[in-house]
């Protein structure tokens, strides 16, 4: 298990854009399972939507991507790199996520070679699928000159 502080030592995201509270399971370069406790204090609920707060789907996808990044960046060859989206495939949203929900975030790598990868991702609340699909990503070295 990884705490929020440990996660911040692996991926560069910080509040308010760090969307993982803890990692329950991780196999570097293979898979990760994370948790996001959704509270009414999230900044995005101020405008999405007043009186009917719903977590934006794109932020659920971002939370899934951050979970995948933890697994990818824990590999020795990727330490210090930046995980970035290169594509989103077949993403489906099946349930609204609201304040009080605990979002379980699962990412399983389908392919990962030479810093490029594809992962199957699923977000659930109480065992019910909120979002599922596939994402593509790359691990880039921000210190290299173009």
Curated annotation (Swiss-Prot):
Pfam families: FabA (PF07977). It comes from the Bacteria. Belongs to the thioester dehydratase family. FabZ subfamily. One of its GO terms (biological process) is fatty acid biosynthetic process. SUPFAM superfamilies: Thioesterase/thiol ester dehydrase-isomerase. It comes from Acetivibrio thermocellus (strain ATCC 27405 / DSM 1237 / JCM 9322 / NBRC 103400 / NCIMB 10682 / NRRL B-4536 / VPI 7372) (Clostridium thermocellum). It is found in: Cytoplasm. Keywords: Cytoplasm, Lipid A biosynthesis, Lipid biosynthesis, Lipid metabolism, Lyase. The gene is fabZ. Coiled coil: none annotated. One of its GO terms (molecular function) is (3R)-hydroxyacyl-[acyl-carrier-protein] dehydratase activity. Its main location: cytoplasm. This is 3-hydroxyacyl-[acyl-carrier-protein] dehydratase FabZ.
């Amino acid at each position: 298990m990884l705490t929020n502080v440990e996660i911040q030592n692996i991926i560069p995201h910080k509040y308010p854009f760090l969307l993982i509270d803890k990692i329950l399971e991780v196999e570097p370069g293979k898979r990760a399972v994370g948790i996001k406790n959704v509270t009414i204090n999230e900044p995005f609920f101020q405008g999405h939507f007043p009186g009917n707060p719903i977590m934006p789907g794109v932020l659920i996808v971002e939370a899934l991507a951050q979970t995948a990044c933890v697994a990818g960046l824990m590999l020795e060859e990727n330490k210090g790199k930046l995980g970035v989206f290169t594509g989103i495939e077949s993403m489906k949203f099946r349930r609204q996520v609201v304040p009080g929900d605990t979002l379980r975030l699962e990412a399983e790598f389908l392919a990962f070679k030479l810093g490029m990868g594809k992962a199957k991702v699923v977000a659930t609340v109480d065992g019910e699928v909120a979002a599922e699909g596939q994402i593509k990503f790359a691990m880039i070295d921000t210190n290299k000159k173009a």
